[in-house]
């Protein structure tokens, strides 16, 4: 399916990293089909840490954010011994490639 471009507001409940990428999640279990994942490129992660003065993976927990981008369903493969299995699930991701796409909303 096509993605839906827009500006979205979310409460972040969890965060995780894979390599230098950061993932902010709207549910504590990122596999929950209701969860929206904001995937942040490594260069933006570094900028966010510099801007907020603390690691981005902890800073955003329990904060409300506004993110601009395309919400898109992506297929996530289950892996075994470094190889994709024939099992998978879906997540909704919004990719962030610029710090301008993301801001904390003051409540």
What do the PLM-derived regions correspond to, one by one?
Residues 1-107:
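OB-fold single-stranded nucleic acid-binding module
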């Amino acid at each position: 399916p096509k993605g839906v471009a827009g500006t979205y507001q979310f409460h972040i409940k969890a965060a995780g990293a894979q390599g230098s990428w950061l993932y902010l999640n709207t549910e504590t279990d990122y596999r929950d089909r209701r969860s929206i994942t904001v995937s942040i490129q490594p260069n933006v992660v570094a900028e966010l840490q510099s801007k907020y003065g603390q690691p981005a993976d902890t800073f955003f927990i329990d904060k409300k954010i506004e993110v601009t981008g395309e919400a898109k369903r992506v297929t996530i493969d289950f892996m075994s011994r470094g190889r994709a299995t024939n099992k998978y699930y879906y997540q909704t991701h919004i990719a962030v490639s610029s710090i301008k796409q993301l801001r904390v909303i003051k409540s």
